[in-house]
C-alpha cells in the first residue's frame, strides 16, 4: 500500500515507521530537522521495540496520489496541512488519527474520503529522527461518520501486520466524541493544576469536576444525534486509571510553550452546544482558563 504520513511527528513517525518496517511504501511528510535526520540516518524507533527503518521522508507534498493519507498533525494545523496537499486529497482515503472533533469534516470539504481513528499508543519525539514508543495501545478506525467499507478493513489488516493492534468500528463518530468528551475533562484539569492524571481520580474534588464535565459533554453530544458504543463516564475512569502516571499532552504543550488543542476539544464541544441551543458553562470555564494560561506564558516548568 502506498501511504503518506501527513504530519510526521511522534505518532505519525511511529505509525509510518512500523508500516515501512513490514514493507509498505511509506513517505513521511514533516518538518525540517526531523526529516533531515531521517534522510541521513534512517528513522529510529526505541522503547517498546528497537528498530532502524530506512523510509522516504520529505518536507514537501509528493505529486503522485497515494492509496492512503494518514493525517497526524495537531488539529490546529489541519487546515494548512490539507490545503497544502489538496491536489492529492481529492478522492483519496484520508485517515485522521488526531485529537478532537471536526477534522474529518475538513477532509470531506476538500473532497477526500475520510476514515476516523483514535489510538491509545503513546509516543514521544526524543530528538530529530528518534521516536520513543512509550505505550502499546489499541487503534480504532472506521468509515466516517458511520458504516463499513472494504478498504477500511484492508487498512486494519495492514496496521495489524505492522504490529499496531487495530480494530474496526461502524460508529467511529461515537468513539471520537467519547474520547473528546473524556479529554475535555482530563486535559484541561491536568493542565491548569499541573498534576498527573491519577491525581484527578484520587482527589474527590477533581473527580467530581471531571464527572460533571463529562455529563455536560454527553448531553451536548446526544442532542447532536451522537450515539455511544461505550459510556464516556466508564471511559473517563478507565483512562484515568490506565494513564495515572502521565502528565497529559495539553500540560506538556503548555510546559513547552506550545499552543494546545483546547480549541478542538472543549472549544468544539462549545460550538456544538450552540448548534442545539444548549449552554456549556463548564467547558467554557475550562477552555477560558487554559487559553489564559497559554497567554500568560505557560506553567511552572
From Swiss-Prot:
This protein's UniProt keywords: Coenzyme A biosynthesis, Cytoplasm, NAD, NADP, Oxidoreductase
A single GO molecular function term of this UniProt record: NADP binding
Cell location: Cytoplasm
Chain positions recorded as substrate binding sites: 179, 183, 187, 197, 246-249
Main location (coarse class): cytoplasm
PANTHER family: 2-DEHYDROPANTOATE 2-REDUCTASE (PTHR43765:SF2), 2-DEHYDROPANTOATE 2-REDUCTASE-RELATED (PTHR43765)
Protein family: Belongs to the ketopantoate reductase family.
Entry protein name: 2-dehydropantoate 2-reductase
Organism taxonomic ancestry: Archaea, Methanobacteriati, Methanobacteriota, Thermococci, Thermococcales
Amino acid at each position: 500500500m502506498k501511504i503518506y504520513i501527513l504530519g510526521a511527528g511522534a505518532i505519525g513517525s511511529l505509525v509510518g515507521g512500523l508500516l515501512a518496517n513490514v514493507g509498505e511504501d511509506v513517505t513521511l511528510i514533516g518538518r525540517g530537522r526531523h526529516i533531515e535526520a531521517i534522510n541521513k540516518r534512517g528513522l529510529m524507533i526505541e522503547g517498546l521495540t528497537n528498530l532502524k527503518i530506512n523510509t522516504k521522508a520529505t518536507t514537501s507534498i509528493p505529486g503522485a496520489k497515494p492509496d492512503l493519507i494518514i493525517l497526524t498533525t495537531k488539529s490546529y494545523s489541519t487546515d494548512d496541512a490539507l490545503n497544502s496537499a489538496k491536489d492529492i486529497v481529492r478522492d483519496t482515503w484520508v485517515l485522521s488519527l488526531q485529537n478532537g472533533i471536526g477534522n474529518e469534516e475538513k477532509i470531506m470539504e476538500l473532497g477526500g474520503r475520510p476514515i476516523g481513528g483514535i489510538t491509545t499508543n503513546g509516543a514521544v519525539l526524543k530528538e530529530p529522527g528518534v521516536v520513543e514508543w512509550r505505550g502499546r495501545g489499541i487503534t480504532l478506525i472506521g468509515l466516517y461518520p458511520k458504516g463499513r467499507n472494504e478498504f477500511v478493513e484492508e487498512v486494519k489488516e495492514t496496521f495489524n501486520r505492522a504490529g499496531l493492534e487495530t480494530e474496526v468500528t461502524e460508529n467511529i463518530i461515537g468513539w471520537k466524541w467519547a474520547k473528546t468528551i473524556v479529554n475535555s475533562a482530563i486535559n484541561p484539569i491536568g493542565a491548569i493544576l499541573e498534576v498527573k492524571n491519577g491525581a484527578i481520580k484520587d482527589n474527590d474534588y477533581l473527580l467530581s469536576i471531571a464527572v460533571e464535565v463529562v455529563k455536560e459533554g454527553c448531553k451536548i453530544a446526544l442532542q447532536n444525534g451522537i450515539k455511544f458504543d461505550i459510556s464516556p463516564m466508564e471511559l473517563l475512569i478507565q483512562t484515568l486509571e490506565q494513564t495515572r502516571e502521565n502528565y497529559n499532552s495539553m500540560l506538556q504543550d503548555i510546559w513547552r510553550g506550545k499552543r494546545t488543542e483546547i480549541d478542538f476539544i472543549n472549544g468544539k464541544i462549545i460550538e456544538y452546544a450552540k448548534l442545539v441551543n444548549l449552554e456549556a458553562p463548564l467547558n467554557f470555564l475550562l477552555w477560558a482558563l487554559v487559553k489564559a494560561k497559554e497567554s500568560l506564558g505557560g506553567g511552572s516548568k
